């Protein structure tokens, strides 16, 4: 029987593959799900981690750059993606305790590198955890385009376009709304399958 995949490790491989090939995210995601056995809970976590990290990458990289003593574009790819995934979980998800996120990321960093990369990962992520809820993005008063773009992970050109169209308040609301994960509701046709069988 095939061993169940680790959703975080699989997410690192997915993001690394995307960077190297430039393939479409949905196709890569579907392929990895087909090739790697995941429970429904782990599949949901894997999907959320990959989509969320891609969506919030600009914000995540700003946070990482604030705490990394090395330029993040000089880090080995898998170490960087492992850090990005962990920062996404710490900053934007609350289903897994921060200590567990850090612990898992450190284990993966050791597997992908060595004790030095594990210690580096641990140090960076502990600083991220300490800053949660009070991390300072670029000041709105200094540059509203940069503030909204970095904080909400949008390119400056689209923020400028929205500001011209809607003004500052509505643009910020739009940025927030665009980053909300839509709720998923599943209706089961019990004539074809039971809810219990569907959840397997």
Say what each PLM segment does.
Residues 1-200:
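Class I Rossmann-like S-adenosyl-L-methionine
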């Amino acid at each position: 029987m095939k061993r169940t995949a680790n959703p975080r490790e699989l997410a690192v491989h997915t993001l690394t593959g995307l960077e190297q090939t430039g393939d479409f995210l949905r196709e890569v995601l579907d392929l990895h799900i087909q090739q790697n056995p995941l429970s429904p809970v782990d599949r949901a976590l894997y999907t959320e981690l990959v989509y969320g990290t891609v969506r919030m990458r600009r914000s995540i990289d700003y946070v990482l750059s604030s705490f990394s003593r090395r330029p993040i574009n000089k880090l080995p790819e898998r170490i960087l993606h492992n850090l990005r995934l962990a920062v996404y979980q710490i900053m934007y998800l609350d289903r897994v305790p921060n200590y567990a996120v850090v612990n898992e990321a450190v284990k993966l960093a050791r597997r992908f590198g060595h004790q030095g990369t594990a210690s580096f990962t641990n140090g960076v992520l502990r600083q991220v955890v300490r800053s949660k809820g009070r991390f300072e993005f670029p000041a709105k008063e200094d540059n509203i385009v940069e503030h909204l773009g970095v904080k909400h992970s949008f390119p400056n050109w689209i923020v400028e376009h929205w500001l011209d169209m809607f003004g500052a308040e509505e643009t910020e609301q739009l940025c927030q709304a665009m980053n909300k994960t839509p709720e998923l509701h599943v209706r089961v046709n019990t004539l074809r399958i039971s809810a219990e069988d569907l959840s397997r």
